[in-house]
Amino acid sequence: MRRLPWLIPFFLVNISNGNNEFRIEFEYPNNEKSEKCFDSSKENDLLDLFYVSTNPLGPVVECRFLENSFILCEDPVPLYGPGQTGQQPANESFRNEGKCLKMGGYRAEDVEFTNVKCRVLPCIECHGPRTFTKSTPCIIYNGHYFLTTLLYSIFLGVVAVDRFCLGYSAMAVGKLMTLGGFGIWWIVDIFLLVLGVLGPADDSSWEPYY
């Protein structure tokens, strides 16, 4: 389908310091494409400015309601560090800092939530503050696949390849030196993986297959 040039928006950005507004005006040129937009990754001092769209052809969505593909959020982090545990804090204020007491979970109801900082990607039009906090599950992914690890454990578990891949280096050396704990450790790790007891040492979750 032929694209008409007058349908291509031209963004003209004006920053108004007097009324603390970030205003975008829209024009429709007849002959050439041109676009200027707000790059929130470079103008850190303007991240919290509001703007009003004067585009009469479409509604403007609240920035905090945008889909994940249009925003960039920080990753949740363990409160006591990867693979570490500690006492229950006296208050829950750490959840407003993107920190989690426990990462992941074997069931959906076991997963904790925390508030992380997010910002809108450059050139995405929305209404309201371009930086905000969003509730997100305490789940991180670091490239560990369950099926791959299970195959390592079945076929190469005797030489501790599965433990090395999961990040248990010290235990992997012991398993390697004893050739899979004389076969017993090798079998036990397979069952631990299948039952969901054994996972990555950095508290990350298994990568989804989609």
Curated annotation (Swiss-Prot):
It is a multi-pass membrane protein. Residues 1-18 form the signal peptide. It comes from the Eukaryota. The keyword Glycoprotein applies. InterPro entries: TM2 (IPR007829), TM2D1-3-like (IPR050932). Glycans are attached at N91. Keywords: Glycoprotein, Membrane, Signal, Transmembrane, Transmembrane helix. GO terms for cellular component: membrane. Belongs to the TM2 family. This is TM2 domain-containing protein C02F5.13. It comes from Caenorhabditis elegans. The lineage of its organism: Eukaryota, Metazoa, Ecdysozoa, Nematoda, Chromadorea.
